[in-house]
Every structure is written in C-alpha cells, then in structure tokens.
Swiss-Prot record:
Induction (record text): Expression is positively regulated by the acurin A cluster-specific transcription regulator acrR.
One GO molecular-function entry: monooxygenase activity
KW Transport (keyword) present: no
Protein known as: Cytochrome P450 monooxygenase acrD
Residues the record lists as binding heme: 447
Pathway: Secondary metabolite biosynthesis
Lineage top rank: taxon: Eukaryota
E.C. designation(s): 1.-.-.-
Necessary cofactors: heme
One Pfam family here: p450
Glycosylation sites: 210, 414
Cellular localization per UniProt: Membrane
Length: 500
C-alpha cells in the first residue's frame, strides 16, 4: 500500500488541471509523433533524393494537391533532385522510362491502396477505376468489357454524331454574321457531357443547347473534391461532407429505376447504351460481384472520366493547332482529302479513322505534351522492391510520372515542341506501342474507355474542322491544374470561329 501511495504522490502533480491536459497531449500525441518522425528518418524512403521536409511530412504534397498543382510540384522536384524523388514519407515519384515501363507494364504493379482506397463511394465495393486487388479487378473488367469492345463502340457513332450536330448548329448560329469569338472550352466540355449522357444514360443533358445542367455541374465539383479526398481521406469523417452528392445519387438512382421498370414491362426494344448493358449484367444475389448499386457508382465514374478527360484532350489539341497555323493548314488539307468540301458523307470512323494519320499524330502529340494523367496512375509496391538502386519498402506508393517521361529530351528530341510529324514515321514502322508513351496508362490497367475516347475525338474534331475555321485568340490564361485529370485552370477559353 505504501508503494501505491508513493506512486500516486509522484503522479499527482500531473493529474490535476492544466497539467493533466499537457500530460495527455504529451502521451497521446507528441511522443507518438516523435516516434513516427524517428521511424521516417530511418526508413529506406529517407535515403531517396528529395527535401528533408517531404521525408517527414506529407503537408507540402497535400497543399499542392489542394491547389491543383501536384503536377507542377512533381516536375519541380524532378528538376532539382533527378529521376527518383520523395513526395511524402510514404510516396515517391519516378521519371525513368525503363522503371516506369517495368512498373506499369512488365510487372504491372497494383494500384495504390493509399490513393485509390479513398476513391470509392462504397469502401467495400470499388468501381473499375478504384480496384486495387488484381483478381477482383479482372472479374469486374470481364463483366463490362463487352461494353467497351470496338464493335459496340462503333454502334454508338449515330448517337455521338447527333450530339455533334447540335454543337455544329449552335456554332452556325453564333457565327452567322461572320467570324466571332466563342468560348470553345465550354462548348467542347458541354459536347462531351452530352455524348456521355446519351451513350451512358440514353438521354442528352442538352448542355450545348441550354448552357447548363445540374448533373454535370455537380460532377465538376465532385471532381475537385475527389482529387483532394484521395490524399486527405480524413475529410470524409467531417459530418457535413457526404460520401455521395445527394443530387447525383438521386439522379442516377432515378435513371436506373426507370430503365429497370422499362425492361421489366418490356416497353419497346432494348436501348443501345451503356446503362442497358450494365443493368443486363447486374445480379442482386448475395455473392454477386456486380449489383444494381454498383451501376450508380460506375455511371458516375463514366460521367466524370469519360467527359472531362476526352474534352480536355480535344480542347488542348485545338489550342496547339491554333498556336501553329502551318500544322492546322496541313490538317485541313488531310480532312479535305478524306471529306471533300460539301461532301454529304457523315464523318465515319470506319471510313477515315485509320487513314487520317496526321490528325492522329496531332492528338498523340497533344496527349504527349499535356497528358491527362500528368503524374501517372499511382502504383504500390506489394513487396520490398528496388528502383534505380534505392530500396523501396513494401506498401510504398509510387507515381510513374507520365509528364516527365513524355518530355524527356533523350527519348523525344525537341520534347517541348508541338511536332505531330514525329509520329508519322512511328506509325509507318508500327512502333507506336513500343514508345514510352502512356496517355491511357498501360498493362492490365490500361484505360478501358480508350477506344470510346478515340472515336469521340475523331468524330468531334473532324466534324468541327470540316465546317469551321478556327483562329487563335492571344492573351488568355493557358496554365493547367491537375484534379484527377489535367485541365485548364480557367473556366473559359475563346477561339475565333467562322464558317469555312
């Protein structure tokens, strides 16, 4: 009893009033933090080049992400420290072409749980984008692969062309009295959203006609938030920040319910869109890998990824062409060879896509210079690894940075210049797949919608350039931000548009 009394006496000064608060703070936070920092100082990651601050805390990376500047943050670090750098205590970036190929293609590392684990509406049921388990991903991919097969995508051309026709009519109205400045950023983004609406849900959002629609507007906000939540998951624990946007949930649930009712009552022939395919693939059995609830989440991903990334690629392609009038003139010549002026033939991928090599070169060159996945799709070391001679502990997130390998002067002479011609010899030799070029990632996680995007870009750009003349408007902000995908920082971009 005396010993207990002595211990109580020793602790008494620390168990009263303000002292108790400081004691709890010391034991519960400060000491564990000090141990954490010591672990980080002696971790193998600490030996990788980079700022000592980044090896201790992820705060600088999180600030860059919140500002939409993680791609700039990464570029600056690689310029200063070389081909492998520390981003945070558990995240690194690599720009070496051989190691990137090994990670994303040869060894096909799994996606990072630390990143994609936070990119889920339902933590227990990932979308195709957010699977980190290879086996589960393969199972889901098999279920939906028929929806993205080339034959099925080609069958969507009439739906896409209808949306493009609406845009063409709108541009005709705007330049009826001669060439005029048009916000082509808004127009192209609206077109992409309308195309995703009609091909996914069987209904257009009429964004081109009306200028706005609640769903795409809410999804743009969700896109910004998703980019932040990937690296700051603790924000989801704040009560007033929901995992799902209420309007998006209501809209997608309503659409799915109506379509299921139509199918059950056999009202008319089956619709030819992605929603129909997903509903047909869904199974409500307890062990089902794809339920009706999964349709909503996959639909949201299709809307965000399908409209934003494709629209950005189209917009950046036009911007680069307008900056280089001689390249634009060459493209007009190619378009006129395939589709002579006043030719009534509709733009058709089966007819012209494989033959219009200069257009494809312009698109590929743009996606090389401004890749959608600027910092690369983050992967994870599932065992202890070695990269460029450095030990990489199991569980480390590795960013195989696309933008750095795309701008490597040793791989791409005059790397920062827009030179579509560099691709023509590559195509002729059949070497496109051997290049260090990853606009759609690679390996098993190559973008499942790449053929959909390629078709939409071909139809949209060819149709626009067949009818309209575009000219550059100088003095605009052309800087980019990175939020899930690389995009324009500003919310409008003007081009002078007139009839040819």
């Amino acid at each position: 009893m005396a010993e207990i009394h002595d211990i109580t006496g020793l602790l008494k000064p620390y168990l009263s009033g303000t002292n108790l608060v400081w004691t709890l703070l010391l034991v519960g936070y400060i000491i564990p933090k000090l141990f954490q920092y010591l672990q980080r100082l002696f971790s193998p990651v600490s030996r990788i080049p980079g700022s000592w601050l980044h090896k201790l805390t992820s705060l600088p990376l999180k600030i860059a992400i919140a500002k939409g500047e993680s791609h700039i943050f990464t570029v600056d670090l690689h310029k200063k420290y070389g081909p492998i750098v520390t981003l945070s205590p558990t995240m690194i970036s690599i720009s070496d072409a051989r190691e990137i190929k090994r990670i994303v293609h040869t060894e096909d590392w799994a996606k990072s749980e630390a990143v994609y684990g936070n990119f889920r509406q339902d933590p227990q049921r990932p979308t195709l984008l957010a699977f980190t388990d290879k086996k589960a991903y393969s199972q889901r991919k098999r279920l939906v692969s028929s929806m993205f097969g080339l034959r099925y995508i080609r069958s969507m051309q009439p739906l896409m062309r209808n949306c493009i026709s609406v845009l063409m009519d709108e541009l005709d109205k705007q330049c009826a009295n001669g060439a005029t400045a048009v916000d082509m950023q808004h127009m192209i983004q609206s077109l992409a959203a309308d195309i995703i609406g009609v091909t996914t849900f069987g209904q257009t959002f009429d964004l081109v006609k009306n200028g706005s629609h609640p769903l795409p507007d809410r999804l743009k906000q969700a896109l910004k938030l998703s980019g932040i939540l990937q690296f700051m998951p603790w924000l989801t624990k704040i009560p007033f920040i929901p995992n799902r946007d209420p309007y998006v949930s209501w809209f997608t649930n309503e659409i799915v319910a109506k379509r299921r009712a139509q199918i059950a009552s056999r009202q008319g022939p089956p619709r030819e869109d992605l929603l129909q395919k997903m509903i047909e693939a869904a199974d409500e059995s307890p062990t089902s890998p794809f339920r009706v609830s999964d349709i909503q989440d996959e639909s949201v991903v299709l809307l965000i990824a399908g409209s934003e990334t494709t629209a950005n690629a189209e917009l950046f392609t036009l911007i680069h062409l307008l900056r280089h009038p001689s390249k634009l003139a060459t493209l007009y010549e190619e378009i006129d060879r395939w589709y002579p002026r006043n030719d009534p033939r509709p733009t058709d991928c089966d007819y012209s896509m494989s033959g219009m090599v200069y257009l494809q070169a312009c698109i590929d060159e743009t996606m090389r210079l401004v890749p959608g996945q600027a910092t690369g799709s983050p992967r994870e070391s599932r065992k202890d690894e070695t990269l460029l001679g450095y030990d990489i502990p199991k569980g480390t997130t590795v960013f195989p940075t696309t933008q750095e390998v795309h701008l490597d002067e040793t791989l791409w002479p005059n790397a920062t210049e827009f030179l579509p011609e560099r691709w023509l010899d590559v195509y002729a030799k059949g070497e496109a797949n051997s290049l260090p070029y990853y606009p759609f990632s690679a390996g098993s996680r190559v973008c499942i919608g790449k053929h959909f995007a390629a078709q939409e870009m071909h139809l949209s750009l060819v149709s626009l350039l067949r009818r309209f003349q575009f000219e550059y408007v100088s003095g605009q902000d052309e800087s980019t931000v990175f939020r899930i995908a690389q995009q324009m920082r500003g919310h409008r971009y003007l081009m002078t548009v007139g009839r040819r």
